[in-house]
């Protein structure tokens, strides 16, 4: 496929999302760069059949998998319990594969109850255990705290495989948006024991979150008020990713790619107005450059998590990817 990276006009403007301490998810007035699809598969799933809600065979809610502390903000040092929801198959003849789901939320929230719920329910219906986890976000921690949370969640899953009837040796990581970012960063830095990883419209280089957008939006992402800046430096630091790029690059999964990662699947809408489409491309291309295995889908005319991201077509691609790399 040819490289189509010329400027385009996508002039639908959405309001910024503002969280605690003024942490802001800046949205563009327009998308000015057309996605490079030269190493990706372009699909149009917007008007295809949608997933239907599914009732889990069994689901345990609000399990405390970690007793932690708030490490940033005005409540620093106070107790913070982190929870997990897990859908599982207690009566399956043999243990199922296990999917660890890391929810998105712009680094300012992580909702384990609703984030990507249709996809999780339908993965569970296809005989997977699916565990969704909370983690530190802006206002109660830093990005590196979240990496520790993921490690602790994985340890919890390792220690409870018999209780929930899954095979921990068949661990899959799935995340969307901010959760996609952590799917990439954690898996690339800690590949041992992970069979494959699925990153849906996730961030990567936090100095380039707005690189595909109008200049005002791009520059706003570099300021102290952006959620990514507060996540790296702290909500009261007054520093932006544009002030200390060296420190920001420590949080960039691209910089840790070796080519020895588990297989990756990326999916990203070409009209995403929260996370520049090029963010997943950076990781995908680096993995390919290093000789690793990565597949990337670009969803035509789809915004952030919308359109084809709750389609049966998407689910089928995910199921095939898992089957090809786990079973």
Predicted regions and their residues:
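Short beta-strand element of the alpha/beta-hydrolase
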Residues: 95-105
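Short beta-strand/loop motif that positions the catalytic acidic residue
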Residues: 260, 265-268, 272
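Alpha/beta-hydrolase active-site loop
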Residues: 142-162
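Gly/Ser-rich "nucleophile elbow"/oxyanion-hole loop immediately N-terminal to the catalytic nucleophile
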Residues: 158-176
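Hydrolase active-site cap/lid region
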Residues: 185-242
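N-terminal cap/lid segment of alpha/beta-hydrolase-fold proteins
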Residues: 34-93
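Short amphipathic alpha-helix adjacent to the substrate-entry channel of hydrolases
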Residues: 113-131
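C-terminal catalytic histidine-bearing segment of alpha/beta-hydrolase fold enzymes
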Residues: 267, 274-277, 281-327
């Amino acid at each position: 496929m040819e490289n189509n990276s010329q400027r385009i006009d996508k002039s639908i403007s959405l309001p910024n999302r503002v969280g605690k301490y003024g942490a802001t998810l800046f949205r563009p007035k327009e998308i000015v760069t057309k996605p490079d699809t030269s190493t990706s598969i372009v699909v149009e799933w917007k008007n295809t059949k949608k997933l239907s809600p599914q009732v889990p065979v069994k689901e345990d809610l609000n399990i405390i998998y970690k007793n932690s502390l708030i490490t940033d903000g005005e409540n620093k040092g106070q107790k913070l319990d982190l929870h997990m929801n897990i859908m599982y198959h207690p009566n399956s003849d043999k243990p199922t594969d296990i999917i660890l789901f890391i929810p998105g939320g712009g680094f300012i929230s992580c909702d384990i109850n609703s984030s990507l719920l249709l996809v999780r329910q339908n993965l569970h219906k296809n005989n997977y255990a699916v565990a969704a986890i909370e983690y530190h976000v802006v206002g109660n921690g830093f990005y590196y705290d979240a990496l520790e949370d993921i490690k602790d969640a994985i340890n919890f899953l390792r220690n409870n495989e018999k209780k929930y009837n899954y095979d921990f040796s068949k661990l899959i990581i799935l995340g969307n948006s901010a959760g996609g970012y952590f799917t990439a960063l954690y898996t690339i830095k800690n590949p041992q024991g992970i069979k494959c990883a699925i990153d849906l419209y996730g961030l990567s280089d936090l100095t380039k979150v707005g690189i595909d957008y109008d200049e005002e939006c791009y520059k706003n992402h570099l300021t102290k008020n952006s959620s990514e800046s507060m996540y790296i430096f702290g909500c009261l630091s007054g520093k932006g990713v544009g002030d200390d790029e060296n420190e920001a690059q420590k949080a960039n999964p691209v910089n840790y790619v070796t080519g020895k990662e588990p297989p990756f699947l990326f999916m990203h809408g070409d009209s995403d107005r929260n996370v520049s489409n090029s963010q997943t491309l950076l990781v995908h291309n680096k993995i390919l450059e290093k000789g690793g295995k990565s597949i990337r889908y670009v969803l035509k005319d789809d915004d952030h998590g919308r359109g084809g991201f709750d389609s049966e077509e998407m689910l089928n691609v995910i199921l095939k990817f898992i089957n090809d790399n786990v079973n």
